Amino acid sequence: MAPPRCRREKLNSTVAEGGVQAADGQRCQRGLPLLGAVPQAAPYTRNNGMGECRRGHRQGHRAEVHDNRPADKVGQGRWLNSQTRRPCRKEVTSFQFFPFLIFHTGGAEMEPLEIMDEGEGPLVGWCDPDEFREWVRDNKSREMADKTMSAEEAVSNFIKDGMYVASGGFGHVRVSMNIIYEIIRQGVKGLTMAGKTSVHDLDVLMAAGCVEKVEAAYSFGHELRGLSPASRRKVEGGEVKVITEWSNAALQWRFKAAAMGLPFIPARILMGTDTFKKSSAKIIRDPYSGKPVTLIPACFPDVAIIHVHRADKYGNAQIDGILVEDYELARAAKRLIVTTEEIVPTDKIRESPWRTSIPYFLVDAVVEQPFASHPCNMPLLYYFDEEHIAEYLALTRTEEGAKEYFEKYVYGVNDFWEYLEVVGGSKRLEKLRRIEQLRERPVYPWR
């Protein structure tokens, strides 16, 4: 019987009892001579043996033996029998993709990475990146469709009880308070929130009883205004659970990994800290250097809410100033609600395409609402409403006070326009605009 040959590599080999002996000159995928015998596997199984060269490189995907017949790899990891030109009943190679290394298992079991340590927190917000990609393909259209709607419609359509929600912006800067208030007004409950520098937005949702779990990086602190009395009361009372803890960088890199289509991202942070213990990260031994490296799992929120300076009706959105994590967050979330200070013609967007950090095909809803970040800051447009924030912090020291606040500013109004009238109307808003433009000095009640 003629010895089996790989049609692609034309490697010479001889059949020996119990296996295929590597002949002189036979080489691995990196061109190094193979050593020793390659055990012959049972027909059409995934356990085909692989020869190794003196550097440990496997013959693997370059030459395999199926039932004493040669095989070719064609296309994307598919194998054809060289005689019948039909696919084998089982594919014999598999690939495991990681951001820093590709392990080729050649049909044999892959040696597991050495996990040196792992955090105690639950893994939430994670899914298989390939499943996420498939979901996006099936559920998000690239059609240039008009996505404008009201805040009420956006929340009703896309935010449901128990979802994982992430809010863009930074602390008290560029946050979608109109959507936050609408979530409360519609009575959404049981949310898990990503607390990556989420302060006023997260705090208001917690005070209203909408949040059940938090992944915390920087939360509950109102900077010089002090710690949040409402969030502290909710956490200490057990109504809200902080399920994991992260650094700001780590939580943002979770979104980055998701945006890149990766299951995790490696970094040299968190190691040796209590933050790591409270996270769901893992520490492995780097297969290159042998040193420890942290694997930070990706995070795919169910819904992201991002406020921008301008957008067109299709969702092409522009942010003036620092993006923080919003570039990554927009690409990591399954659904994206964009609120904007103004809707502009698409031609206006095209005049400065480098500003368009969020393209239309990522967006599910576009909500136009001037001053939507109030009482927080919108860079270049209006300043923090310190008087209103002080009123909120004072009232939410007690449950009764929190109910009074929400009755006045959320349940007692029909929409955000009415809310803006209640907080002071155009006169108050113009004052905040002048302060942001350095034409008037701010007054800080907490001094």
From Swiss-Prot:
Gene Ontology MF: a single term: CoA-transferase activity
Q: Where is the composition biased (Basic and acidic residues)?
A: 61-72
> Which keywords fit this entry according to its UniProt record?
Transferase
Q: Which residues form a coiled coil?
A: none
Region described as Disordered: spans on this chain: 39-76
Alphabetized Pfam families for the sequence: CoA_trans
The UniProt entry, under InterPro entries, shows: CoA_trans_fam_I, NagB/RpiA_transferase-like
Q: Which family does it belong to?
A: Belongs to the 3-oxoacid CoA-transferase subunit A family.
What name is this protein filed under?
Uncharacterized protein AF_1199
This chain's source organism reads Archaeoglobus fulgidus (strain ATCC 49558 / DSM 4304 / JCM 9628 / NBRC 100126 / VC-16)
